Amino acid sequence: PLFVKPKLGRVPDYILADDKITLGTTAAYRRAISFVAEGRANAAGAVREYLHTFSENLQSFQLPSCDNHSDYYEHFMTSIKDFVPYRDEWLELLKNVCRNDLIEVTFDSHMRFFESIHLYTKERREVTYVYQEEEDNMKFIEYELMLCFIAILLKNECFVAVADLFNTSFYNKLGNTEYDVTYTYREFEHFLYTTYNQNQNASQRYYSLQA
């Protein structure tokens, strides 16, 4: 034949995995990315719906109880790798939001998104943790998303949004006193004992785990 159909590419491992974690954001993502690209009037609403679905279902990435560091580190690394497709999906939508000058009308939705996922970094009473390593994978995910958020805003010269972020007071609905009911973007930067302890036991140590 004149034109030979190319062979199918390799299916990503995360799709074939039997126990893969899914956030159920596919439909909301496609709708949001389409509305943003087409300049639809309800594009901001579609973005808000996607961010809400994402933050609500991110809870599925929380790790189960574990009392052994090596086992916890293995689960930690697996969850980080499994999250990559969803991080990339989230980033792609954010890039399109910035390119289409929609960051101003979706800024509050993004702030509520970060408030929601920040709750997953808090210690759960019903879970037994490895010493000082509670919710480290969620802290890593949150920190990475915040860094990416700032980077994309800067790359697209959304300087007003960056300034607003740095001046925003986030609301902690679990706060008990006037001192912990609000917090700033600095709360999204975490020291991860999981990677620190693993680095201490490794033959080749990294100078900076956050760089």
Please provide the spans of the model-predicted regions.
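Long, low-complexity, intrinsically disordered terminal regions
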Residues: G9-A211
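Conserved beta-strand-loop-alpha-helix hinge of the TIR/SEFIR fold
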Residues: P1-L2
